[in-house]
């Protein structure tokens, strides 16, 4: 049974539908493409073509064009729409055209930076060019830090390390601050409350130091879909931004279902365990060979779900390899 058939069956199942409070269907969308810009370094298109990228999504091209005009931008498009390319292309293009150019990437967590930067490493290795990319965080060995400060074209770090490990020691980072062309801030929706206000102050210290050393970097911010991305980005960096919120990536049909676990005690209003219902529904999907991602609120929840789900979907030989747990 494929996903479409399973959805049709669930819609006809009263015991399931009586617990659904809302069901929204978002139709599929065709991709919108744009050619590579003429300003793009000629070493990039062949490498992208090797990865199956022969043209850009419209929002990726818009991001490149706005960056080329010197504007600060904020990209707000769905997951898996190619946001990473929106900042990697302008950054790599600038460094390939001027080997002195530098870029600073900020991610809220070390795990996220490791995931996102892997694509950047692959592009650089495929081009076989001398663009040195380093991660600079608490795990960076002391012996490697001098090389990062002196030779790093792209420095990948987090707000805490920027605050405590880079800005106070700016005299050791002269090469970076004198030539800083781009500052990339990914996942800006994570910077809210005290965390967000702290980052805003750190960014103001960063821009003040850049002015002292004679540079004026552009900011490229990326965010998940939120109500006020432009306002948030402008508040964080202290400057107006151009918002790119129309994704050119294709998307399949989506079903958004709000589901309440069934009531097991009407007098007390007690409902069935969320964990048990999650296991039941996800087992149904896995049994029908439908690729599924289940999110838990904590690491413990993920571990419990993974263990029980593996028990439910074991084949006759005891193999539960179709189910894997993932933690950042």
Question: Can you name each region flagged by the protein language model?
Answer:
Residues 84:
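Walker A/P-loop
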Residues 4-51, 55-58, 62, 68-81, ...:
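Helicase motor core with emphasis on the C-terminal RecA-like subdomain
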